[in-house]
Amino acid sequence: QINAATVTTSGTQTYNDPLTLLNNTTLTSNGAGALGNVSFNSTIGGAKTLTVNTAGTTLFNDNVNIAQLTTDAPGTVQINAATVATTGTQTYNDPMTLLANTVLSSTGVAAAGNISFNNTITGDKTLAVNTAGTTLFDKAVSIGQLTTDLAGFVQINAPTVITTGTQTYNDPMTLLANTVLSS
């Protein structure tokens, strides 16, 4: 359990046990490269927000069910979980690699449910994004398969969205850039 507003280390952070957030929490590692990795090797729960700041890799190795999730820009994020669920926004500012077929979902309404990918997404896995808010793809996507649900909106500001399988957009889509969709 974490009841602190901040946890800051000069090196790695590894959470091997199920983690419950009792407070809105920012985890920061000031380590360079792999010395800055923040790894969650079990579930994360709690009706609180989680922000992870690191120049290393943020690794989610199990399911997440929290209020809000944000990762910063200098590092990378890897998702090896079946689900990342929030009641609010999800904002990924790092390049993302999918290590498992993953469903990202938010039950937030309108802007409170936005799921934003502000950097690239790679990995030969399936990504499903379910939200009544806006799903934003701001950089290039190169994955196995992509599906968005019916409830929200999709905005694409990326030059390319490439999949080895299908792409299914069930939301209304707005193109913010000249974009090539390729499967």
Question: Which positions does each model-derived feature cover?
Answer:
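Extracellular lectin-like interaction modules
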Residues: 1-183
